[in-house]
């Protein structure tokens, strides 16, 4: 199986705009994305007004289908709100997870 990764970097005009976006996205998208096949979603902050999102899908067609449902319109609306958007995507060449149990952080 070849997993597909879509990474999006957003640069907002302010920290408030970034936090508003994250709040709205988390409440409306999480469950639906997982129902549509999303395997993993990671967000990380690179600055007070910037965030990077990483989405791992089972394949490109699943990622593209979900993008057509919500992503294209969302990205257009964000661009119109002066949000800088950079997208990177492709087939994942390696997907490894550490087998160590991290539930006990004292290990």
Tell me the role of every PLM-derived stretch.
Residues 1-51, 58-72, 79-107:
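Short S/T/G/P-rich N-terminal loop/turn motif that feeds into the first structured element of a domain
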